[in-house]
From Swiss-Prot:
Functional description taken from the UniProt entry: Probable neurotoxin with unknown target. Possibly targets ion channels.
Keyword Chloroplast: no
GO molecular function, one term: toxin activity
Name by which UniProt lists this protein: Conotoxin Pl171
Keywords noted in UniProt: Amidation, Disulfide bond, Ion channel impairing toxin, Neurotoxin, Secreted, Signal, Toxin
Annotated signal peptide: 1-21
GO cellular component: extracellular region
Location in the cell: Secreted
Modified residues (Phenylalanine amide): 69
Length: 70
């Protein structure tokens, strides 16, 4: 693999990581406010709902589903 291809792959991984992180933040909200606060049950209920739908029908498990919760 050439240097350009490796650089492109690294950029792709960074982009995907950023998109997934941003999308999950929209779904769950910030997981912590920096003070080790107790988690908000509503946020985890939404994630549990998403995972149950995703596990029930894996063909619908993509990033576009995450956007409906935002």
């Amino acid at each position: 693999m050439g240097m350009r291809m490796m650089f492109t792959m690294i950029l792709l991984v960074v982009l995907v990581t950023t998109v997934v992180s941003f999308t999950l933040d929209r779904v769950l909200g910030p997981v912590s406010d920096g003070r080790n606060a107790a988690p908000d049950d509503e946020k985890f209920d939404r994630m549990e709902y998403f995972l149950s739908k995703c596990c029930a029908n894996p063909s619908t498990c993509d990033l576009s589903l995450l956007c409906i919760f935002g």
